Amino acid sequence: MKRNWMAFCLAAALMTAGTVYAKPAPSQLVPEKHGQCYVEDNLFVKDVNGAGGGQGVLHGDFAFRREQALKTDAIKEIGWMTLKPGSYIGIHTHKDNEDAYLIISGKGIFTDGNGHAWVVGAGDMTIARPGQTHGLANLGKEDLVFLDIIAKNDSADLSKMAKEGTTQYFPVSAQFEKNVEKAGAGKGTGILFGRFAFRREAATQDQAIKEIGRMTLKKGASIGMHKHVDNDDTYIILSGEGVFTDGAGKETVVGPRSVTIAGPGESHALRNDKDEDLIFIDLIAKNTPVKGQTK
């Protein structure tokens, strides 16, 4: 996996070196059913000044934002974020949702709810669950680029979660490997290599985000077409080029910064036909709606 990690770091550096163009945010962000595939050209820009009580502009290129999420969606928001040198997201508390910062490139300072601060860089993963606080600062000389993914479980016992005090910081060195053959309900080919902050087997019923991993598909390997019954699964491409298949059987070529998702009742698949490794984030989240809740 060392070779894969070096390839990811190089790709991240190249991906963030050039100018990226994205369309402006829609004039109105309203709840609607999101699509399954957002290539880079589909992302829209929304910037926030002083995010979390911080300083400077938090630049965001989004597949979709929380204002567009349905009540029953587990994953509420996915964005590629940039903090310029000297900018920071202030330390703030999450009341009823979960927020993961997954570092792509640059260096920053992540602060957790206990006031502990760590230098974070490419590949490090962080999370704030209900009742926890976090902040992120760019004190370096280059842009700090990271994925920001927000999820929510409406039936979570918030008071219980606030007392649990689960881990918030997962450096590359603490992540663990787990590889799967024929991924996708046994329908895939080859091996899906994974390096995880945590996996679904260790998740509690209350937690919305069940799993975060950095995955690799080698040439000729694939995740077979499979359906998600009661959770959301997003593949976010970091480097390489692959072919994503949605529930309707439509194939789309996906590359760096592409965002894909399958919700409850939806199917998806991903394959790598190229020589270069296909590296992506795989995040699984689940929302158990409260009784009687509708869209």
Where would I find each of the regions flagged by the language model?
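A short, N-terminal "cap"/entry segment at the start of jelly-roll beta-barrel domains
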Residues: Y21-I75, A122, A156-I209, G224, ...
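Short beta-strand segments in beta-sandwich/barrel cores
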Residues: S87-I89, G106-T111, A221-I223, G240-T245
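Conserved short histidine dyad/triad with adjacent acidic residue
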Residues: F62-R66, G79-H94, F198-R200, G213-H228
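Bacterial N-terminal signal peptides that target proteins for export
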Residues: M1-F8
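Ligand-binding loop in jelly-roll beta-barrel domains
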Residues: P130-A156, S258, P264-V290
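Short acidic-glycine-tyrosine-enriched beta hairpin
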Residues: G115-P130, G249-P264
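Bacterial N-terminal signal peptides
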Residues: C9-A17
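Glycine- and acidic-residue-biased ligand/ion/polar-headgroup-sensing regions
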Residues: D96-G108, D230-V243
